Structure formats: structure tokens, C-alpha cells
Amino acid sequence: MPDITDLFAQRATLRRSTSLLTAFRFEQSAPERFYGTLAQDTVHLITDLWQQAEGVALRGRTVLDVGGGPGYFASAFADAGARYIGVEPDPREMHAAPQGHRGIQDPRTTYLRASGMALPLADNSVDICLSSNVAEHVPQPWRLGEEMLRVTRPGGLAILSYTVWLGPFGGHEMGLTHYFGGARAARWYTRKHGHPPKNNYGSSLFPVSVRDGLRWARDTGTLTAAFPRYHPKWAWWITKIPALREVLVSNLVLVLRPR
């Protein structure tokens, strides 16, 4: 029986992983470079999952991006023919795009200022609901997930992708110091740079595990697939190994299909 990840698995090569890893170095210094690469990869991910699930292209489908920031993904999804709706609670983030980036100004897209934990959309109103690297920044990540499921129509897809706390990128700009504890890492960062990290432990960065994500997703009865987002296909088995997955999975993708 075909798996919903079959198409994307063909794209999940070591070359892709290396390209994304290279881009990560520019998240803070050149965000347009990092997020541009990530946007294209995300469109490929969603397109492949949708094509495998529905047998049709993404064109004409409504995609809700929860925590869309300044709209780094907006134009990429619009270029793919999707009806893009972005949701972002922080007005500073909405306008944080570098000069020359259309983001929320792209006339083909719609943007809403709202919290992902209280989405201002009706039940069953979108085909695809995506949240990329947001769950670790909210104090109630599974409430965010429940809201995503609520607004996704039966048969649609909700894709929740988040950075794993004990993975190599869990500390974000604090680097690997998060392995000494989040609060301590934040203090060290502040001492070194003269200001707190943007992703500050306990206020804008929270520890989210693979175990808790899988447990929540299974309890919803809608889990269709779970895999490490940036790993090549031959390394996806890591997700099945407790403890090891918490350290080696940098980002977990949960694919949910409401019924």
C-alpha cells in the first residue's frame, strides 16, 4: 500500500540535507537566503504529500501557514498556485522581512494577525494547515496542533513541523550551550552579546520533545506519518528509537489527516 511520504522520500537525499544544513548558517546573518531555501523545500514537501494523498496538484488549494512570520513562504506557495493564508501574532515579525522581499505585501496572498493557539478561521475551512518551526516557540504546542486540526477539513492535511529541544539546533542562536540547560544557555548568551537571545528560553523558546509530539499525534487518531524533516530517507529509522531520536532528530514532521 502506498505511503503518504513515498513521493517526498525520493527527494529526501543526502545532497538535499547538505544544502539545507549549509543554509542554516545564514538564519541570523542573511535570513532571506536561509528562508528562501527553506521556503522552496517546504513547498516541495507539502506538494509531494498532497500529491501522494490526493493524486492532484497543489494548485487552487488553500494553505494556511500558522506562524508565518514576515511571509517568507508566501510567494513560494503562491508561485505553486496555492491560495496562501499566513497567520502571525507578532507585528514586529510580520514586518521583519529584508528589503526587497515581498512577503506579506504579495498581492496574491492573505495575511492575518492572530495567535496560532486561537485561529480566527471556521472549522474545516482549509485544505492544508502548515506550521513550520513554530511549536517550540509557544508555551502550549499541542493546543496549537489542536487548532490546526480544527480548521483543516476532513481529508485535508495538517503538517506540524518543529525543532526538537535536545537536537543539535534546539538552542537556536544559543548554539549547543542548551545542553547545559536552557536558562543557563540564555544567561551565557546575554553575557557574551550584551542582550538576550531572540529565542529566549522560557519566554519565546520552550523544550519540545519527539516523544511528546508522537504521543499527542497518536492520541488525536489522525497521525499518518512522522519523520525527521532534514534527514535523508535512509536515516528516517531514527524516529523509531527512543532516547536516540531526541538527540539525532533536529526537526520532527507530524503529518495528520483529519477524518
Curated annotation (Swiss-Prot):
Keywords: Methyltransferase, Transferase. The keyword Aminoacyl-tRNA synthetase does not apply. CDD domains: AdoMet_MTases (cd02440). One of its GO terms (molecular function) is S-adenosylmethionine-dependent methyltransferase activity. InterPro entries: Methyltransf_11 (IPR013216), SAM-dependent_MTases_sf (IPR029063). Pfam families: Methyltransf_11. The keyword Translocase does not apply. Its EC number is 2.1.1.-. Signal peptide: none annotated. One of its GO terms (biological process) is methylation. It comes from the Bacteria. Belongs to the methyltransferase superfamily. This is Uncharacterized methyltransferase MAB_4481. It comes from Mycobacteroides abscessus (strain ATCC 19977 / DSM 44196 / CCUG 20993 / CIP 104536 / JCM 13569 / NCTC 13031 / TMC 1543 / L948).
